[in-house]
Regions:
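Short, low-complexity disordered leader/linker segments with a strong preference
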Residues: 1-31, 56-57, 61, 104-114, ...
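Hydrophobic alpha-helical segments within soluble ligand-binding/sensing domains
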Residues: 28, 74, 135-168, 187, ...
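Extracytoplasmic "Venus flytrap"
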Residues: 29-50, 54-55, 63-80, 86, ...
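Solvent-exposed loop/turn segments at secondary-structure junctions
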Residues: 38-42, 68-72, 94-98, 122-126, ...
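Short, solvent-exposed amphipathic alpha-helices that sit
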Residues: 43-58, 144-148, 183-211, 231, ...
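Hinge/cleft segment of the Venus flytrap/periplasmic-binding protein
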Residues: 58, 167-172, 176-180, 184, ...
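Hydrophobic alpha-helical
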Residues: 91-111, 116, 192, 214-294
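Flexible loop/hinge segments that line or gate small-molecule binding clefts
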Residues: 105-143, 147, 159-172, 176, ...
Length: 356
């Protein structure tokens, strides 16, 4: 009887782990291989958590890989997974500055005759369309910048006098860019300001003014391309030592490409005595609507963000995975309104200010 019980327990353990993923383990034949540009990105971690749950719920064996921001590492991980017999690649590509990295991964998948699904970080249509078993799941990356800019502009029109700390009739801002060469970062950096200026102009207010006139780029970029809170904290801590109310040239507005950088900026502001829950607030805006950002909005240290739906993205990724696995039409079960041509699914954005 004891022997039978032991056998049954062993069988249950095997079943319970059948759909579980590892984090960059050795890999095995038939599994779905999921590659993340980094595990440390808060939004991407939200996608990973949701996707792990959906994959397990659908009894899909999978393995997660962390490239830690290194494209060479990710490409080697892809090669290893294919050599181990992976049945499908789901890729959050590291390098978005050119088509080379994504095209190389497509070529590897094509040679192995397995599907590849890219997500979140932009991959050009020409790359995706070069293989009939390749699709991309992302967002209308320009829309996040447009929505953020409009949200900022409307907030400033309603609160102009309060935000204009030095009373010069203009709003001085800092922009934190996540990565050079990344299409999402480029669009958010441009439209976050342009669309805000359009709202200000319509209200008879002057354009935003970048705090440092010597910076012709009009942004500060994470040199590691990781969209990190640390980069924003370091930049803003340094800037606040020179640009302050005491000097009459205060930074009065913070715009960030993502919530991680927005939260990093808040850390620097709080160290300088702002956004602490009492006293003066310098408005901070981000993108992603992470839980940490929602908490910051709730406690008043952040004003607003643009929701990037991590759960919605994970759900679509797993639906596409099942479609490829089961031989169904690629976009079966996906909202047709979000399907672009034969190569892409866009996950909608939404504004988030804590009131919606």
């Amino acid at each position: 009887m004891k022997k039978l019980t032991a056998i049954l327990l062993a069988a249950l353990l095997v079943f319970s782990f059948a759909a579980c993923g590892q984090n960059g383990g050795p890999g095995k034949t038939g599994e779905v291989s999921v590659f993340y540009y980094t595990f440390s990105d808060t939004y991407i971690s939200s996608v990973r958590t949701a996707m792990d749950s959906y994959l397990k719920a659908n009894n899909i064996e999978f393995n997660n890989y962390d490239a830690n921001g290194n494209q060479t590492t990710q490409t080697e991980q892809v090669q290893t997974a294919i050599a181990k017999g992976s049945s499908m690649l789901i890729v959050n590509v590291v390098d978005t500055g050119s088509n080379d990295a994504a095209q190389n991964i497509v070529n590897l998948a094509k040679a192995a005759n397995i599907p590849v699904i890219f997500f979140n970080r932009s991959v050009d249509e020409s790359v995706v369309s070069s293989y009939d078993k390749c699709v991309f799941v992302g967002t209308d990356y320009e829309m996040a910048g447009h929505m953020q800019g409009k949200m900022i502009g409307e907030y400033l029109v309603e609160n102009y006098g309060k935000v204009d700390l030095n009373g010069d009739g203009k709003i001085s801002y800092v922009m934190f860019k996540g990565q050079e060469g990344n299409m999402e970062a480029i669009a958010r950096t441009q439209y976050g300001v342009d669309d805000c200026n359009a709202v200000l102009t319509a209200a008879g207010k002057p354009f935003l003014e970048f705090y440092d006139p010597s910076n012709t780029d009009k942004y500060l970029v994470d040199q590691d391309g990781l969209w990190s809170s640390a980069a924003a904290t370091n930049y803003l801590s340094t800037a606040l030592a020179q640009y302050s109310e005491a000097n009459g040239n205060m930074i009065e507005l913070v715009i960030a490409n993502n919530d991680e950088m927005a939260l990093g900026a808040i850390s620097a502001l709080q160290a300088a005595g702002y956004n602490t829950g009492s006293g003066k607030v310098i408005p901070v805006f981000g993108v992603d609507a992470t839980d940490a950002a929602k908490n910051a909005i709730a406690n008043g240290s952040m004003i607003g963000t643009i929701k990037q739906d991590a759960d919605g993205m994970a759900n679509v990724l797993v639906q596409l995975t099942k479609n490829f696995r089961d031989g169904k039409a690629t976009f079966d079960g996906v909202d047709a309104a979000n399907v672009i041509g034969t190569w892409r699914v866009n996950i909608p954005y939404a504004t988030y200010t804590g009131e919606n």
